[in-house]
Amino acid sequence: MRQIVLSLLVCLGLSACGPRGLVRSEFAGRSNEGPKKVLVVPADFVITEVTFGKTEERVVPAERQASNTLSKHVLALGQKQSAFTVVDFAKLSKPHQEVLLQHRALFATMVSQLLLVKEDAVDVWETKQQYFDYSLGRGMAEVSTQTGAETAIFIVGKDKVRSTSRKVLDTFASVLPIGESLSAQPAAVAVGIVDLRSGDILMFDNEMATRKALTDDADVQAMGEAVLTDFRDTLKSREGGKTGGAK
């Protein structure tokens, strides 16, 4: 976990994190010194199952499994590193947990717009790619004061899976024009790195995969790792002596 988070935060000292992610503009050119304490908020996944009759239902056990799988995988990736302390979300007071979960929900509502900025999908947001300045507000400042954590990581995801009967229908749909198939529906994971004191979103990135599902542990691990790949690559480049210029 520490290696991944450090590599994410090292990007604050660079002019960019490669072609995938968005970095808050005012941090470009800043020192690459990372925070001493980082708080990782449990991932929030929304998984719905589509039946033969096209009704949709939330699959809560699958959502919890995906969240637990990702958390364990991310922690395993950073076990050998000790650059800074990871604050255990489970040990926070209930009021502080609720505050963080509320801000995670707020982040989730912003993802669609952040994607438009990242993909340069709407001309009016072209400036936002260069001057990225979204914020969740100062509602988490007390959590930072009480825990000493400077930064939080929010991860959200969404997927549609098929019931057995729906899979049978989609098998026929692949060879006969009898209806819309869900086989091409992409699973999606998005990550936000947030300053706890100001609420500023420091970085944002996402991963979408058509042939992966959040109900598959290996796929969850792969998507969670993919969404952080560019940031880890940036750390490796910095360690190799490469530096990025400020905008």
What are the language-model segments listed below?
Residues M1-S15:
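Sec-dependent bacterial lipoprotein signal peptides
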Residues I4-S7, A28, K36, Q97, ...:
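Homeobox/homeodomain signature
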